[in-house]
Amino acid sequence: MVRASTAELLRNPSLSIRARSSLASPLYLHSKGLLERPVFYLSEYFESHREEYIDCLNALHQNPTAWEPWLLFFLRAVDEQARENMRRAAAMQRLYKELQTEFPNITNSASCGLLLDAIFESPIFSKPIISGRIHEVNTATIHRMINSLLDAGILHMRTNGAGRRAATYQLRELSLIAQGLPIERFDY
């Protein structure tokens, strides 16, 4: 795989100013060692504050010395998105801990911890994908555990399988938390 440098990405003429600023922020923070990986995306904040975001960019475009409004907006975005990400991470940890106690009762398998870890690594999955990740457990046991979790309502079918295409499943609660949506299990 060929990786473009940060500078190459940001010089790409097909990217809008908006796209460049969305990419530049986490890449810059990563380059300064403030992020382990450049995965702190501000797009969600920018979308929810779209008008102010566009106003700040337009003001900067019209007056290249008008950095203060943009910087204040950007710092507020970092602060609020960081708080939201921390809230979501805490909710994910809480869900994981609760499922650690529920999975053994539902699956009746000592290997359920491996399945839980694999599901948290890939909340949308197929049985073949999960079976390929958990080498310590035979495929029939993995399928039985997944079916038990489906019957219990923990997992949900996302797409039906057809022909050679496997059905996909999801841990809906984890997907909802990742989107910032509430789950019935707990308020966070």
Segments (PLM) and residue ranges:
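Phosphate/pyrophosphate-binding active-site loops
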Residues: 1-89
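Hydrophobic, well-ordered secondary-structure elements that form the walls
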Residues: 74, 130, 142, 168-169
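Short conserved micro-motifs at the rims of enzyme active sites and ligand-binding pockets
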Residues: 85-86, 128, 180-182
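Short alpha-helical segments that sit at the start of domains
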Residues: 87-116
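Short, cationic-aromatic polyanion-contact patches
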Residues: 109, 157-186
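Short acidic, hydrophobic short linear motifs in intrinsically disordered regions
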Residues: 116, 121-134
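Short amphipathic alpha-helical interaction segments
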Residues: 136-148
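Glycine-centered, phosphate/nucleic-acid-interacting loop/turn motifs that mediate DNA/RNA or nucleotide
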Residues: 153
